């Protein structure tokens, strides 16, 4: 069953926030519709989150020994790995694929992550960073990925890099403020 909702604002982040607010389901799975994500992994996500009710999210990684990645352009792969490893170091995290869109979340956890400040692809960085920095329970599982099968990418690295940097600093400052508040 597919439902279409009118998005009151422009942007991917706003569209995802609208869907989170309108959803009545327990879990929300976010993935790209270019068929690069292996839809069989949705079952792995769901089974993982159902087995452990404490989990707020299951974060997929394309970069574990059990993942299979094909047709990833070299420059894009290199920049992706570089960025994700820098993020991993900055946030002292065990997760290595923050920029990947394909994840599953408990809806009630997503509601607590609102508002979403990202308007574009950087929303896929914002959500897992908030999961990690706010100490929600998550599990990392290997997923498969193959290059885009349909459509044309709207991702422009020069335009998007500043948005990703903004999101990174936003979440870093939030982490610092949350840590001070807990003391």
Residue ranges and their predicted role:
Residues 104, 111-112, 129, 180-183:
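Short linear elements at protein peripheries
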Residues 35-37:
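Acidic metal-phosphate-binding loop of nucleotide-sugar-dependent transferases
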Residues 93-94, 116-119, 128-146:
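Catalytic donor-sugar/metal-binding loop of nucleotide-sugar-dependent glycosyltransferases
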Residues 7-22, 27, 40-121, 147-165:
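Acceptor/aglycone-binding surface of glycosyltransferases and processive sugar-polymer synthases
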Residues 166-183:
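Terminal low-complexity segments of carbohydrate-biosynthetic enzymes
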Residues 125:
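DNA-recognition element of transcription regulators
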Residues 1-4:
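Acidic donor-binding segment of Leloir-type glycosyltransferases
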């Amino acid at each position: 069953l597919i439902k279409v909702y009118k998005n009151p604002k422009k942007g991917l982040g706003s569209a995802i926030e609208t869907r989170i607010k309108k959803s009545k389901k327990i879990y929300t799975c976010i993935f790209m519709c270019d068929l690069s994500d292996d839809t069989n992994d949705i079952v792995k996500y769901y089974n993982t989150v159902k087995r452990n009710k404490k989990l707020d999210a299951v974060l997929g990684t394309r970069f574990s020994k059990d993942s299979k990645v094909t047709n990833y352009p070299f420059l894009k792969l290199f920049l992706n790995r570089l960025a994700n490893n820098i993020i991993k170091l900055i946030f002292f995290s065990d997760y290595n694929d923050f920029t990947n869109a394909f994840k599953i979340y408990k809806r009630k956890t997503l509601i607590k992550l609102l508002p979403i400040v990202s308007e574009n692809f950087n929303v896929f960085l914002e959500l897992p960073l908030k999961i990690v920095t706010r100490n929600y329970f998550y599990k990392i599982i290997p997923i498969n990925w193959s290059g885009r099968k349909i459509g044309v990418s709207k991702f422009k690295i020069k335009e998007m890099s500043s948005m990703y940097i903004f999101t990174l600093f936003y979440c870093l400052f939030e982490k610092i403020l949350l840590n001070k508040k807990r003391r």
